[in-house]
């Protein structure tokens, strides 16, 4: 056992305009080459586009999208006796949100379209409605976990 103290878990800071932690998590994941101001710009433009499209609060759409994409269970590769098994594991809320954000950004990057703000807003609206690539990814993960349920005892 380690003699060092355990690191305290950092709480996510909230962004300056919406005062929301999810927005800040999204900004930190979309960030490339340390250009945080550009990341904020993209997110705020996307949220503005969501406001125009749906005529509802963009934060509620964002929350709904992330809630819809957050997985409850995932599979983890584990080597047992020379063969690798996909072992289903439960996911905590923080890790689930992080995965959901990663999937949403990945799906929006793959989308055809003009700019990232437009693609992200479209993906978030789709995810909030219950369709889109990120939702498909979640369902695929759940299917994998269900198919490999027999290996759950390898945890």
Swiss-Prot record:
GO MF annotations, alphabetized: mRNA binding; rRNA binding; structural constituent of ribosome
Family annotation (SUPFAM superfamilies): Ribosomal protein S7 (SSF47973)
A Pfam family it matches: Ribosomal_S7
Entry annotated with the keyword tRNA processing: no
InterPro entries per record: Ribosomal_uS7, Ribosomal_uS7_bac/org-type, Ribosomal_uS7_CS, Ribosomal_uS7_dom, Ribosomal_uS7_dom_sf
Recorded GO CC terms: chloroplast; ribosome; small ribosomal subunit
CDD domains for this protein: uS7_Chloroplast
UniProt keyword terms in alphabetical order: Chloroplast, Plastid, Ribonucleoprotein, Ribosomal protein, RNA-binding, rRNA-binding
GO biological processes: ribosomal small subunit assembly; translation
Similarity remark: Belongs to the universal ribosomal protein uS7 family.
HAMAP family: Ribosomal_uS7_B
Role noted for this protein: One of the primary rRNA binding proteins, it binds directly to 16S rRNA where it nucleates assembly of the head domain of the 30S subunit.
NCBIfam families cross-referenced by the UniProt entry: rpsG_bact
Designated name of the protein: Small ribosomal subunit protein uS7cz/uS7cy
Source organism: Amborella trichopoda
